[in-house]
Design a protein with these regions (language model features):
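A domain-level signal for the structural core that forms small-molecule/cofactor-binding pockets
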Residues: 1-130
Length: 130
């Protein structure tokens, strides 16, 4: 039941939104073993003039960038799975975004089961009340 928050540099593009969402959903399902029907992905766009890396805007550098944050229940994935996920997501972004800046971050956020949930129930509650 992960939720992903994604920032992409550039103008809003429905095709890019769909491609990035599909890539993230596939990586999340295949590598982190999360159920696609419980995966939510929110994608927002930021103009390159307003995204600063190393003191210069992406527009000035002629680069694109992305930031991907995924919240998952703590202790549900290994370090190796999370490392593989970060690698796969970065490689997926490289294929979809021209001139991707090296400093495009992917953050896997392990959230305590008692502090995270959906539908009004925590993951801890779900684990003990199937």
């Amino acid at each position: 039941m992960p939720i992903l928050n994604v920032l992409i540099s550039g103008p809003v593009q429905a095709q890019t939104t769909q491609q990035v969402a599909e890539m993230l959903a596939n990586c999340t399902s295949q590598i982190l073993h999360k159920k696609p029907e419980l995966t939510s992905i929110a994608i927002r766009y930021i103009e390159p003039e307003h995204w600063i890396v190393g003191g210069q805007s992406l527009a000035t550098q002629g680069k694109s960038s992305a930031y991907v944050e995924i919240k998952i229940t703590d202790e549900t994935n290994t370090r190796a799975e999370k490392a593989a996920y970060i690698q796969a997501v970065y490689e997926g972004l490289l294929k979809l975004m021209p001139n991707l800046h090296h400093e495009s971050y992917i953050h896997v956020d392990d959230v305590r089961a008692g502090a995270y949930g959906y539908g009004g129930k925590t993951q801890e509650y779900r684990a003990h009340n199937p």
